[in-house]
Amino acid sequence: MSRACLLLVVAAVCLAGREAAAFNYADALDKAILFFEAQRSGKLPPGQRVAWRADSGLSDGSADGVDLAGGYYDAGDNVKFGLPMAFTVTMLSWSVIEFGDMMPARRSSFLGGIFGGGGVAQLDNARAAVRWGADYLLKAATATPDTLYVQVADPYQDHRCWERPEDMDTPRSVYKVTPQSPGSDVAGETAAALAAASIVFRVSDPSYSAKLLDAAQLVFDFADKYRGSYSDSLSSVVCPFYCSHSYHDELLWAASWLHLASPEKKDVYLSYIGSNGHALGAEQDDFTFSWDDKRVATKGFLQSRADGLQLYKAHTDNYICSLVPGANGFQSQYTPGGLLFKEGDSNMQYVTSTAFLLLTYAKYLSSSAATVSCGSTAVSPSTLISLAKKQVDYILGANPAGMSYMVGFGARYPRHVHHRGASMPSVRDHPARIGCDEGFRYLHSPEPDRNLLAGAVVGGPDAGDAFADGRDNYAQAEPSTYTNAPLVGALAFFAGAHKIFTP
């Protein structure tokens, strides 16, 4: 983010409201990033900060003769699902790309040093979170020619047990997509993740960045050449958990990231988007952004970075209008307490992704001195920022329940998270194995979590702002990496803006 653009965006924050920040966004950002260390699979590094975790899944991939150790567990179980993991890496990368300058790596002289955080290594830790996922995706994409490994473990077998990752003895089956069993959706998202991550490391580690970009281009070519959905090829193990509604959006999403990541080939990917956009559904309005649907994000991403895409801007504006209460085109649902509500299972994933898009679009509008036309109403960047702030603040505690939905943040937060590792004694404190069936007593226990899953954002309350803090209540009490990933960017924005305008 350029200095001039940053000042324009932060000026919009001031217009949105001059009151002091209600929350310590920098602390929330630290915790949101820390959560990813609790989700790590594989050989943990010396600098691992979540001390109650230990090595796990070290032989992952051996069932197919490849090394698939590493990566992230997506939520509260011990499965490594490729589609949500790749989306997580894409969104973590986008958070760093868009708002990394607002994450202090060390005391900065930028704008007079006002980003100083006492040496808080937020940017370094965010990059580490990106790299942990990107390393795994790189292995999954390059281990075998014309093959992308997309999942480790049968979720049905995994869910028959309640085990710590360090103890798991359920089959670590390996699943892949190939020319004969295609998966353009998961391959497209993997290409997007690798391309986005390559931008993150372009300056700090050029050789690694180049390796990621090369792999991204290969995986995209594979996804485009062998078209088909992994929900068809691997339906028995990816559905109903992470069924993909279509692979069309992932192909355009991946091409968009490759357009940004490949300066020497940007015209090639832009031409692909122009030639394939109609067939891949780019001319349809859409109102949701998630691990399964990237259409609105792709349009917003592209129209702010490429010329000649006026239709994409119109669709993005329609999406924005759908979110703004009172605007022409408004069609979203909010709880009585003001939380965006899409659906009952893990609703917070839509809240965080929406808040992120609102802020990135506000940044674009500010830099262009533009607004969104919702009928006769001109919606300003400050309105988008204010709306995003309300969503973030709701998560952190400004809600009817007066509780934070981020574990470890504030005085009141969920204490019974649907998460195996958090609910059971740490392997550090209880080295003896806890078996498959034995673990269920921790799932059903009324006792609070044994280990603090700091930074985890749970699924959240229902349409009436009600929340049941129960470990059995996976729809409301389970966290996920793809909920936290876009929140990292949103929190970085508000942490940085707060530092600028607080005396």
From Swiss-Prot:
<keyword id="KW-0326">Glycosidase</keyword>
<dbReference type="GO" id="GO:0030245">
    <property type="term" value="P:cellulose catabolic process"/>
</dbReference>
<keyword id="KW-0732">Signal</keyword>
<dbReference type="InterPro" id="IPR008928">
    <property type="entry name" value="6-hairpin_glycosidase_sf"/>
</dbReference>
<feature type="active site">
    <location>
        <position position="418"/>
    </location>
</feature>
<keyword id="KW-0964">Secreted</keyword>
<dbReference type="GO" id="GO:0071555">
    <property type="term" value="P:cell wall organization"/>
</dbReference>
<protein>
    <recommendedName>
        <fullName>Endoglucanase 4</fullName>
        <ecNumber>3.2.1.4</ecNumber>
    </recommendedName>
</protein>
<dbReference type="GO" id="GO:0005576">
    <property type="term" value="C:extracellular region"/>
</dbReference>
<dbReference type="Pfam" id="PF00759">
    <property type="entry name" value="Glyco_hydro_9"/>
</dbReference>
<dbReference type="GO" id="GO:0008810">
    <property type="term" value="F:cellulase activity"/>
</dbReference>
<dbReference type="InterPro" id="IPR001701">
    <property type="entry name" value="Glyco_hydro_9"/>
</dbReference>
<feature type="active site" description="Nucleophile">
    <location>
        <position position="77"/>
    </location>
</feature>
<keyword id="KW-0378">Hydrolase</keyword>
<dbReference type="InterPro" id="IPR033126">
    <property type="entry name" value="Glyco_hydro_9_Asp/Glu_AS"/>
</dbReference>
<keyword id="KW-0961">Cell wall biogenesis/degradation</keyword>
<keyword id="KW-0624">Polysaccharide degradation</keyword>
<comment type="similarity">
    <text>Belongs to the glycosyl hydrolase 9 (cellulase E) family.</text>
</comment>
<feature type="active site">
    <location>
        <position position="478"/>
    </location>
</feature>
<feature type="active site">
    <location>
        <position position="469"/>
    </location>
</feature>
<feature type="signal peptide">
    <location>
        <begin position="1"/>
        <end position="22"/>
    </location>
</feature>
<dbReference type="InterPro" id="IPR018221">
    <property type="entry name" value="Glyco_hydro_9_His_AS"/>
</dbReference>
<dbReference type="InterPro" id="IPR012341">
    <property type="entry name" value="6hp_glycosidase-like_sf"/>
</dbReference>
<keyword id="KW-0119">Carbohydrate metabolism</keyword>
<keyword id="KW-0136">Cellulose degradation</keyword>
